Regions:
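Helix N-cap/coil-helix junction residues
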Residues: 118-119, 155, 170
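Generic C-terminus detector
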Residues: 158-170
């Protein structure tokens, strides 16, 4: 783990998938952990290969995509990448099904899981995003209707699945 004190403005823009790539600014600073200091995991410059059940064979080099992986931000919050990887590992998840927008982060989660002790990664399937309009994805965090609400409205499980498949363009 690498403590860091870099601000987002110190990070160069990396033009692959519009991600920011950490340049290693704090790698050699010997910062102590504490308030206002985030944590990163130093990723190895290895190629992560996996087969996505929809997209087929994939190869990603996380250290080139994002640099050292942020796992806890300066406010002390664990990142999605870290929390999802730990949850999947602890719960013994063997199949991760999620949107295409997360395909590019799969290699870093596989490498992080291996660093945490997971011998075999789960299988992955990345599906088209479910859109409520041509430019906006469906999102419960934006107040869009969830499965519970659809079931409360009387839709059967089959109707909910049919609706989701239709919205996903399948």
């Amino acid at each position: 783990m690498l403590p860091l004190h870099s601000s987002e403005s110190e990070l160069p823009t990396f033009h692959s998938n519009d991600e920011l790539r950490y340049a290693g600014t704090c790698r050699d600073r010997a910062l102590a952990e504490g308030p206002g200091v985030g944590l990163r995991v130093r990723l190895e410059p290895t190629l992560e290969r996996f087969v996505d059940l929809r997209h087929g064979p994939q190869a990603q080099q996380p250290s080139e995509q994002c640099g050292d992986l942020l796992v806890r931000d300066r406010d002390g919050n664990w990142t999605y990448q870290f929390a999802a990887t730990v949850d999947d590992y602890v719960q013994g998840v063997t199949l991760v099904v999620r949107g295409d927008d997360l395909l590019a982060s799969t290699g870093r989660q596989i490498q992080l899981a291996r660093l945490l002790g997971r011998a075999e990664p789960p299988a992955f399937l990345h599906h088209p995003l479910i859109m409520k309009s041509p430019l906006q994805k469906l999102s419960k965090s934006d107040g869009d209707t969830g499965i519970r609400e659809l079931r409360e409205r009387g839709l059967t499980p089959a109707q909910v699945i049919e609706r989701a498949l239709s919205l996903a363009g399948v």
